[in-house]
Amino acid sequence: MAELSQKMKELVQPYLASIEPYDPNFTPTSINLSANENTYPVPEGVREAVDAALAATPLNRYPDPMSNDLRDELAAWHGVPREMVCTGNGGDELLYNFLLAFGGRGRTLLNCPPCFSEYAFFASLVETGVRDVWRDPKTFELDCAAVLEAAPSCDLAIVTSPNNPTGDVAPLDFIGKLCEACPGMVMVDEAYIEFADASFGAKTTAQGLIEKYSNLVILHTLSKAFGAAGTRCGYVIAAPEVIDVFAAIRQIYSVNVLTQAAALAAVRARDAYAPVVAQVAAERERVKAALEVLAANGLPVEVWPSFGNFLLVRMAHATRVRERLRDEYSILVRDFSYAPGLADCLRITVGTPAENDAVLSALAVLVKEEM
């Protein structure tokens, strides 16, 4: 972003004047494995159902402001009443609204980096302080003891499970203890939960803790497992009183009619996505094993276990490798070398078998050449 003029600096709120916009560093390529999208084709029959729903949707009417048909379907899927679900324009809107409602000036967010950078960014937009409790620098596991020690002095907390970009899952007993230790709200971002186990995330989700902990919020998205990143649809599950807060502060009509129609059709066809998610998980393990073979053969490669649809990989001169993947092979991956604790790390989305083979073949050449 260009530097603001002096006049604009005087007009904008002082605490916002130096904030940089989120930049995913996107470049058009033949293979894009940089954004943790689901690159698989939409399951057979689902696209037709979505297209039919869109064709039947009038565009001259405002959408249902609460997306109630979609809420009902999501509630039925998760086994909760409608009053425990709120939809949003992607998970990002709900994440921002969480910080808007429960953060603010004089309050502090408990954050566990390396993690999704938008947590700290959105906190800065609503003047919320951030207390970072860093993950283990070698394993990237949560330092549960340190987090629980810091929690009483914080006003709200966010934990990602599986964590982006490291791929680890937060233990359920730890989440319960965090809800007890934190005096405010606790959000568990489960954007990648469907990839975490063989039950589409049902065995790993922290949703079952909501009955005991009314300060717990679970964040979901249709951008990952459902391959619907372009529709921008997310939702939260929480106690009805918490949902009332989300409903009160949300932007009116933030989930448009086309998104509601497409999302409803996709969620109704959720069983069709389970085989796709299972294949992504199998490919994740195959790619991880192939990278470990490179390491066993003496190449400077380190890869961590992951329960998401991505892998975090460390290699020599990662930024240069990423550039050569883009320029010589038309493959885009995400460079995290700029992030504290992630020196020489790339995050590689798990794609289709053909996409994965392409990136593995390229890395076998580039890692050796960049040693």
Please identify what each model-predicted range represents.
Residues 101-159:
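PLP-dependent aminotransferase-like
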Residues 68-108, 315, 319:
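Phosphate-binding glycine-rich loop
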Residues 281, 294-329:
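Conserved PLP-binding catalytic core of the aspartate aminotransferase-like
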Residues 2-61, 152-153:
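N-terminal "arm"/small-domain region of PLP-dependent enzymes with the aminotransferase-like
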Residues 173, 327-328, 338-371:
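PLP-dependent enzyme catalytic core of the Aspartate aminotransferase-like
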Residues 14-16, 21, 304-306, 313, ...:
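Conserved PLP cofactor-binding pocket of PLP-dependent enzymes
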Residues 43, 66, 215-293, 302-303:
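PLP-dependent aminotransferase class I/II
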Residues 141-153, 165-186, 190-228, 241:
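Active-site pre-lysine segment of PLP-dependent enzymes
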